[in-house]
Amino acid sequence: MQAEQLTHTPNGHTLHHTQIQSACGTYLVYDTRNDDTQIGETNKIEVLHVNTHTTQNIYTCVPSSIYGPGVGAATFATNQLTTLFIHGIKNADAQKPYGMTRRTGVAIALQHPQLPIYMDARNVYAPFTPGALRGGTHSHSWHVSGEFISFTYNDFVLEQATQPDADKDLRVVGVMFPKPVEVAIDAAGENNSGEMFSVIVSQVQNTATPGSDDIEKAFDECWLGNQRKLAFQGHVRTTANALQTEIFVIDLPNDLTQVGVSPLEGTAVTRCGVPKGVTQRRLTHTPKGISTFRHWLRSNATGTVVYFLMEDAAGVTQLHEVRIGDGRIKQLSFHASNIHSPFNVHPSAKHAVYFVANNLVLLDIESNTPRVLLESNPDIQLTGIPHFCNQSQTIYFNAYVKSSQGSFIQIFKIAY
């Protein structure tokens, strides 16, 4: 197979793990990181026209330094020409650098570049605000309808809390939806209003009871088709008190603004509360947990199957599926060596794509047959997460390309 290089400038062109292509298929969105760890010092979001291969800067964060604010991890809305990405807090400096609890979601409509739209509101001072969070959202994922956005979250207030009875700052999963939230602007520049109402929807415990379905962390979720349901990864404790990752499912009620057991906005010592009517259940009960290799869950179009990575009997990381209805797990890949990238699944659920042995591999899910599309070589080294095109039998992916100016992450495409 022959891959075609689409970008060439001497900077990074990092694709996020999901929803990188506009619904119309015309654009790919990326940030200019040249290393996955560099969001804090990255200041540009750009789009690539897939037909002309021209690029456009749609947002530049000013001012910018090695301490932040930082932008990155951009996704396209499923129903409009709008991108959403991580944006560090504008007052970032050496004392207050970009971090897990110091970021929010900002959108740009392509017809209005350079005009940031703050999506989730932020208020880190008591009294806190229902619908506003107190820390950092990231890894935003749009529902098929475009109405909801899921995210993972860490809490600045709890991170900074010194009270001995304060909840731990544990990663959780949240959802935002259209309903503007006003927050008073503070002199320090920590707070912002938002176009969306944000809530936390996963229930975590400071310390999970061994052998129970309690979780200490919720992360790396996906929407279940077009349903009001999410699947996510959660850390449980085994009867031997060891941490293990399992898959959980959340059902969302019609009204996410109703207060449940505790306040939606949280308190100085407690987490933001889960809305009334949200239910959470454990889906998998595996012997050793699913893979701890960082990856995001994926679903088929009907939301009846979740795809994930887990080690086989020989300890090799393979692709698996689990059925929502009965929890039955099936191994889909049978490689001799580990899958070593996050994966994506085609909307038809007929194929998956990922990296194995530094090769770009396409898996036929029905027959469990893999096909190597591209072999990595010293001049083109695969990195990141490969993606299926929305409209054609094309895969987009990142690779480092060497040049006289250095080695830079570029965007490629390849047919299959």
Spell out what each predicted region is:
Residues 1-416:
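Sequence signature of WD/YWTD-type beta-propeller architectures
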